[in-house]
């Protein structure tokens, strides 16, 4: 028992609020670990309360697009969400910047009822270049981390406190294994104001202008072969429908042994006609088809650069790079949606789905650019226009 004098000295008061006292020797006997919980990152001292600057982001790890796993999986690690942190001002006490990173899994208690347990999560911090775009595989292959979570662990939330020199940093939150899905909340606390942004958030297209009519040039052997096949299928009207286009493409592509595919679908051919049908006839004449053929050859070479094993498939995780090479930059949300739409159960995209994806995207970009005459990034349409646009893409 504690005598009255000792109680007065330590100002102990009996109240029914869960507080209790024990001797230190008893404490050491019964406990081997103490966790001090602080509801905010503010100072625990009696000094003047300091407000921390807070940045907060919500995101997702989605199979086939942003569930890249930890650094052990270098081929997909770079596809994880990336966040830029610009620390300009050092702390008041020294020339370093105090940063607290907290990564929380969302909705896991609800998902546990469905048999899904907590994912094993962590994060890594890199010195960042000035580039504002989503960084690719080579950056992480040749650059080491500056800080990281102490371990990957299956907890609802993990947090670490770092002292970093002023500069630009890249923060990559991940699950340990690739292809594991979860929603997350990322909070970044800093003593001084810091600029933060999610990388790869740009939506834009750098597409060549449609070719202008020009005097016919002498056709090479490839074009002569295309014309013969085109005229054979088109008949007297010298134009082909979507079904006839399917015959032409499957006939031509089947001769190219480097392209392994099961055939171009009718839906893909409808999308091609919507993109290339300049005169709105619902069909393609030979000049329109020839322009498309030039596009298709470039898209085939692009696909083959990712289909390294010549299986007729490319990894859905590389869709960001493939579309960028084709002149189209998409943000993380859109890439996640495309992976869900076009990737198979092995997170691969076959040639026909790749072609459908790239044709529809270019068509949508061109339609939007034509409607956005003031170049403000905003268009207005009524319900009928929306329906017509949706049915023609």
Give a label for each model feature.
Residues 1-280, 286-291, 295-308, 320-326, ...:
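Accessory/interaction modules and long regulatory regions
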């Amino acid at each position: 028992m504690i005598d009255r004098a000792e109680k007065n000295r330590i100002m102990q008061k009996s109240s029914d609020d869960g507080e209790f006292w024990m001797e230190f020797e008893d404490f050491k006997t019964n406990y081997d670990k103490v966790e001090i919980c602080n509801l905010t990152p503010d100072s625990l001292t009696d000094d003047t309360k300091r407000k921390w600057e807070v940045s907060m982001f919500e995101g997702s790890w989605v199979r086939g697009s942003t569930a890249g796993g930890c650094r052990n999986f270098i081929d997909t690690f770079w596809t994880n969400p990336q966040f830029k942190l610009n620390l300009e001002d050092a702390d008041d006490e020294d020339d370093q910047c105090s940063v607290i990173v907290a990564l929380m899994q969302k909705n896991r208690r609800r998902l546990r009822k469905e048999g899904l347990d907590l994912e094993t999560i962590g994060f890594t911090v890199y010195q960042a270049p000035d580039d504002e775009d989503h960084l690719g595989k080579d950056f992480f292959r040749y650059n080491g981390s500056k800080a990281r979570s102490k371990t990957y662990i299956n907890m609802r939330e993990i947090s670490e406190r770092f002292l970093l020199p002023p500069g630009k940093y890249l923060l990559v939150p991940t699950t340990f294994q690739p292809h594991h899905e979860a929603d997350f909340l990322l909070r970044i606390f800093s003593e001084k104001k810091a600029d933060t942004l999610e990388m790869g958030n740009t939506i834009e297209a750098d597409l060549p202008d449609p070719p202008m009519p020009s005097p016919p040039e002498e056709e090479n052997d490839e074009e002569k072969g295309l014309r013969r096949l085109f005229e054979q299928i088109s008949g007297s009207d010298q134009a082909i429908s979507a079904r006839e286009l399917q015959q032409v493409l499957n006939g031509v592509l089947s001769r190219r042994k480097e392209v392994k595919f099961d055939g171009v679908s009718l839906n893909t051919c409808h999308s091609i006609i919507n993109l290339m049908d300049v005169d709105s006839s619902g069909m393609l004449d030979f000049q329109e088809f020839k322009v498309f053929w030039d596009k298709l050859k470039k898209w085939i070479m692009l696909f083959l650069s990712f289909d390294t094993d010549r299986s007729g498939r490319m990894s859905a995780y590389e869709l960001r790079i493939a579309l960028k090479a084709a002149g189209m930059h998409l943000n993380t949300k859109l890439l996640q949606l495309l992976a869900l739409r076009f990737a198979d159960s092995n997170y691969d995209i076959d040639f026909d789905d790749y072609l459908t994806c790239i044709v529809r995207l270019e068509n949508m970009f061109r339609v939007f650019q034509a409607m956005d005459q003031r170049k403000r990034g905003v268009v207005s349409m009524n319900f009928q226009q929306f329906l017509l646009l949706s049915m023609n893409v």
